[in-house]
Amino acid sequence: MRQPAVRLVRLGRVPYAELLGLQDRWLRRLQAEPGIEAPSGTEAGALLLCEPAGPVYTAGLRGGLTPEETARLRALGAEVRVTGRGGLATFHGPGQLLCHPVLDLRRLGLRLRMHVASLEACAVRLCELQGLQDARARPPPYTGVWLDDRKICAIGVRCGRHITSHGLALNCSTDLTWFEHIVPCGLVGTGVTSLSKELQRHVTVEEVMPPFLVAFKEIYKCTLISEDSPN
């Protein structure tokens, strides 16, 4: 049986708004297709990957930022956006791998919780390939990937009519001081970390991209088709 195919779109370092715009176009594209179980080998959607070009704080469906906090964060020079993903406030910025799979879960044989667990598994596997064997996901209601009490990967998704958007943010060489201005994901008493901090060397988004794609293909049991144009 042929594996479902997923379009791979690598945007490089781009403004966060550009990622959201492309995500919306893929959402409309999938929503316009017939909502039926697809035969084997059918395309299941797109995997959008990028590194944010500038600092952005985002709030999810559960909120997380008051108007006063929003004004304070903007005064720091960061963009602030309210998104449709699950979860509370977090930070995105240079040195971070953003992965937004826009997928019809029916074509992958997945339910939403399995999709979230699969994203966590991709991040755990990447950490293992980088030499961090203690990376773990936590049981619900927690999401993301941790090294002890330090969060290295945040996850927040949205799903409507079986179609997902948003995804994960994994800290490679992120300036972690940006997280000091919020309570990341609403979790008091926990810290954040990055691959660079844990490995004591500079780890770029470009470096981790190939092993991440290997992990994604293995865990989602799909093939990846490179997309020359993001449109």
UniProtKB/Swiss-Prot annotation:
Keywords recorded for this protein, A-Z: Acyltransferase, Disease variant, Ligase, Mitochondrion, Transferase, Transit peptide
UniProt catalytic activity: octanoyl-[ACP] + L-lysyl-[protein] = N(6)-octanoyl-L-lysyl-[protein] + holo-[ACP] + H(+)
EC number: 2.3.1.181
Entry GO CC: mitochondrial matrix; mitochondrion
Annotated transit peptide: 1-31
Residue ranges of the TM segments: none
Subcellular location: Mitochondrion
Ranges for domain BPL/LPL catalytic: 41-224
Pathway in which this enzyme or protein is active: Protein modification; protein lipoylation via endogenous pathway; protein N(6)-(lipoyl)lysine from octanoyl-[acyl-carrier-protein]: step 1/2
Residues annotated as the enzyme's active site: 185
UniProt-listed GO biological process terms: positive regulation of oxygen metabolic process; protein lipoylation
The keyword Magnesium is assigned to this record: no
Domain of life: Eukaryota
Keyword RNA-binding appears in the UniProt entry: no
Uppermost EC category: transferase
MF (Gene Ontology): ligase activity; lipoyl(octanoyl) transferase activity
Site label Lowers pKa of active site Cys, positions: 151
InterPro entries: aa-tRNA-synth_II/BPL/LPL (IPR045864), BPL_LPL_catalytic (IPR004143), Octanoyltransferase (IPR000544)
Annotated binding of substrate, by residue: 85-92, 154-156, 167-169
Pfam families for this protein: LplA-B_cat
Disorder association: Encephalopathy, neonatal severe, with lactic acidosis and brain abnormalities: An autosomal recessive disorder characterized by severe encephalopathy with neonatal onset, metabolic features including lactic acidosis, little or no psychomotor development, and brain abnormalities including cerebral atrophy, cysts, and white matter abnormalities.
More details: In the reaction, the free carboxyl group of octanoic acid is attached via an amide linkage to the epsilon-amino group of a specific lysine residue of lipoyl domains of lipoate-dependent enzymes.
Function comment: Catalyzes the transfer of endogenously produced octanoic acid from octanoyl-acyl-carrier-protein (octanoyl-ACP) onto the lipoyl domains of lipoate-dependent enzymes such as the protein H of the glycine cleavage system (GCSH). Lipoyl-ACP can also act as a substrate although octanoyl-ACP is likely to be the physiological substrate.
NCBIfam families xref list: lipB (TIGR00214)
Matches recorded under PANTHER family: LIPOYLTRANSFERASE 2, MITOCHONDRIAL-RELATED, OCTANOYLTRANSFERASE
Name the UniProt record assigns to this protein: Octanoyl-[acyl-carrier-protein]:protein N-octanoyltransferase LIPT2, mitochondrial
UniProt lineage: Eukaryota, Metazoa, Chordata, Craniata, Vertebrata
Record gene name: LIPT2
